[in-house]
Swiss-Prot record:
Name of the protein described by the UniProt record: Sterol 14-demethylase
Organism: Arabidopsis thaliana (Mouse-ear cress)
TM region(s), chain numbering: 12-32
Gene Ontology biological process terms in this record: methylation; sterol biosynthetic process
Top-level taxonomic group: Eukaryota
Subcellular location: Membrane
Cofactor(s) the protein requires to work: heme
Disruption phenotype: Lack of membrane integrity. Seedling lethality.
Annotated GO MF terms: heme binding; iron ion binding; methyltransferase activity; sterol 14-demethylase activity
Annotated EC: 1.14.14.154
Length: 488
């Protein structure tokens, strides 16, 4: 009897599931975008309904490598609850980068950042307020501010590497991660954090960082231990920065750092930023730059040590600058480092830390692919592009998988020859990375010091890509043998 009851329940369950599936298919047929003409091709995968989701979850880049040759530069992936339309390449991605927020919005797709950044900032506010907050970032990253930050970057690099011995082996990835957070603490979070609270604040940021998991994208408020630690860390950071902000205001003391810029920032209506907003903006700034800078610094060094011709070219550039300026390094001298700039830019082309950029479509629009076909992208789709894939398109970059910094040299400039949005390691258009100049200066300050003061050799195998990280980085150890020297 019990077995019969279980069989009946199983059959009933199967009927219910089958009914729901059929209902969804019927609903999709009558409400689908298929009535529209010129829809992009759709990724087909087995089993139906969930096959595309399974393929996507195995890795967006793996999926793009498989489907781009078959489907082209515009295609849709059905993730059951959402449809993502990919726009790959400058011919079709211009609207992605240039569209207004009312047409293509960041807010919905990046809501998972809100628990980390906190209330009242960035993706927790409407576009008009977010634009004002981005203005605060822009003002904090003006050239006159950057010149002061460079002095701090150089000092931090000198102090950090002075602790290395005459020779030895280090994991350069770990070393650069530590130096980047020290530098960011000084330039962004303020002297108080750097000098007195660095260990405490670093530990709290570590908990914030570890609270951003793949599942956080779908369920940012899920009550799991990592999210609870994230929330406690966010609350504690608010308390720490409230004390620092209050102390600065009471004493009238000012500093040349991003914290001070945010404290002094005012909205158009005259309202000053609150302590909570300042904390949230600082967290957003650190998250935007910390991982990307340390990852790019590591890749840059790994490639320089792998390809001796580029290492020699970067070294010769430093020798020429020393002959011209002496040992001094400042903002203007860093700006003269064109060879090192191209080496960093090429590392970023091959390894942009953010592999996908997304927007939510609020209106229909059309794009025309390289082959002349025009496609209609319906309202309601998530629209995406991939710097990691687009930066390796062979019709834009010659031998795209080869490290070749000279592709950006005068006379070649492959990124410019192919037109706008050909190189998108820092995004572009309305939502281009505000911290791009800061990042280049920071990485140049580090590597110019290393080139001038150390002989370097990569002793571990060339690193692989860590596709499992939220911000795609360098997998495993990157062991480097060093020996002190004085470049002249």
């Amino acid at each position: 009897m019990e077995l019969d009851s279980e069989n009946k329940l199983l059959k009933t369950g199967l009927v219910i599931v089958a009914t729901l599936v059929i209902a969804k298919l019927i609903f999709s047929f009558f409400t689908s975008d298929s009535k529209k003409k010129r829809l992009p091709p759709t990724l087909k995968a087995w089993p139906p309904l969930v096959g595309s989701l399974i393929k996507f979850l195995k890795g967006p880049i793996i999926m793009l490598r498989e489907e781009y040759p078959k489907l082209g530069s515009v295609f849709t992936v059905n993730l059951v609850h959402k449809k993502i339309t990919f726009l790959i390449g400058p011919e079709v991605s211009a609207h992605f980068f240039k569209a207004s927020e009312s047409d293509l919005s960041q807010q919905e797709v990046y809501q998972f950042n809100v628990p980390t950044f906190g209330p009242g900032v960035v993706f927790d506010v409407d576009y008009s307020v977010r634009q004002e907050q981005f203005r605060f970032f822009t003002e904090a990253l003006r050239v006159n501010k950057l010149k002061g930050y460079v002095d701090m970057m150089v000092t931090e690099a000198e102090d950090y590497f002075s602790k290395w011995g005459e020779s030895g082996e280090v994991d350069i990835k770990v070393e650069l991660e530590r130096l980047i957070i020290l530098t960011a603490s000084r330039c962004l979070l303020g002297r108080e954090v750097r000098d007195q609270l660095f260990d405490d604040v670093s530990a709290l940021f570590h908990d914030l960082d570890n609270g951003m998991l793949p599942i956080s994208v779908l369920f940012p408020y899920l009550p799991i231990p990592a999210h609870r630690r994230r929330d406690r860390a966010r609350e504690k950071l608010s308390e720490i920065f409230a004390k620092i902000i209050g102390s600065r205001k009471r004493s009238g003391k000012t500093e040349n750092d991003m914290l001070q810029c945010f404290i002094e920032s005012k909205y158009k209506d005259g309202r000053q930023t609150t302590e909570s907003e300042v904390t949230g903006l600082l967290i957003a700034a650190l998250f935007a730059g910390q991982h990307t800078s340390s990852i790019t610094s590591t890749w840059t060094g790994a490639y320089l040590m792998r390809y001796k011709e580029y290492f020699s070219a970067a070294l010769d550039e430093q020798k020429n600058l020393i002959a011209k300026h002496g040992d001094k390094i400042d903002h203007d001298i860093l700006s003269e480092m064109d060879v090192l700039y191209r080496c960093i830019k090429e590392a970023l082309r091959l390894h942009p830390p953010l592999i996908m950029l997304m927007r939510a479509s609020h209106s229909d629009f059309s794009v025309t692919a390289r082959d002349g076909k025009t496609y209609d992208i319906p309202k309601g789709h998530i629209v995406a592009t991939s710097p990691a894939f687009a930066n390796r398109l062979p019709h834009i970059f010659k031998d795209p998988d080869t490290y070749d910094p000279e592709r950006f040299s005068p006379g070649r400039e492959e990124d410019k020859a192919a037109g706008a949005f050909s190189y998108i390691a820092f995004g572009g258009g309305r939502h281009g990375c505000l911290g791009e100049p800061f990042a280049y200066l920071q990485i140049k300050a580090i590597w110019s010091h290393l080139l001038r003061n150390f002989e370097l050799e990569l002793v571990s195998p060339f690193p692989e890509i860590d596709w499992n990280a939220m911000v795609v980085g360098v997998k495993g150890n990157v062991m480097v043998r060093y020996k002190r020297r004085q470049l002249s």
